[in-house]
Swiss-Prot record:
This is 2,3-bisphosphoglycerate-dependent phosphoglycerate mutase. Keywords: Gluconeogenesis, Glycolysis, Isomerase. Pathway: Carbohydrate degradation; glycolysis; pyruvate from D-glyceraldehyde 3-phosphate: step 3/5. NCBIfam families: pgm_1 (TIGR01258), PRK14115.1 (NF010713). Its EC number is 5.4.2.11. Belongs to the phosphoglycerate mutase family. BPG-dependent PGAM subfamily. PROSITE patterns: PG_MUTASE. The record marks H182 as: Transition state stabilizer. Pfam families: His_Phos_1. The gene is gpmA. The active site is at H9, E87. It comes from the Bacteria.
Amino acid sequence: MIKLVLLRHGESQWNRENRFTGWHDIDLTENGRNEAFQAGRLMKEAGLVFDMAYTSVLKRAIRTLWNAMDSMDLMWISVFKSWRLNERHYGALQGLNKSETSRKYGEEQVLVWRRSYDTPPPLLEKSDARYPGTDPRYGDLSEAEIPLSECLKDTVERFLPIWHETIAPQLRKGKRVIIVAHGNSLRALVKYLDNISEEDIVGLNIPTGIPLVYELDDDLKPLKNYYLGDQEALKKAVDAVAGQSKA
């Protein structure tokens, strides 16, 4: 049996302020750092050990990985960072408060932008200061690879190449892997692993800082998955994510 652990980054400052974050490189709050340490403790208590980690190029995910591995005394493991694990790009919504945006456009429209499979938010202009094309961490990407906005379908399409070409082969070699990423990049992977329909993925919410363990067969098909930790706290965390766009 193969185990894979998925971990959404701890609470960021913009999570706390209920803003659309996307590719903006905001850091963790003190609570978010504590969530990451606690995630590490939960994984250590569960007997989990890792050989390698994959994360995005955004500091909230990187710092979550650092803190979790520090808690597990695994700071030495190999870490691979890729833009393909970034949060989905929220286009012109990045930086806006979710509740205020719901009051302006309506909760139903904002829910479509946040959770539908194939409807992206309004596009960002390349002249906008938020456009990531001038960021050196994306200097090796072609202009076509740098998004102006993304729906979940777009996020799935950019995530799956690194899954098929890099992560899955390591799992098949017996490597013990953790992926520390973002709400929507992890939703993209969960959709693929669990073969969730485009309609049902709307209702899937992934909380910050709580490890999600997948047990996979030799073909990397899920046998079961489960979150570590207190289940009542988990329910509250999932409900909190679901309620973020209420006006």
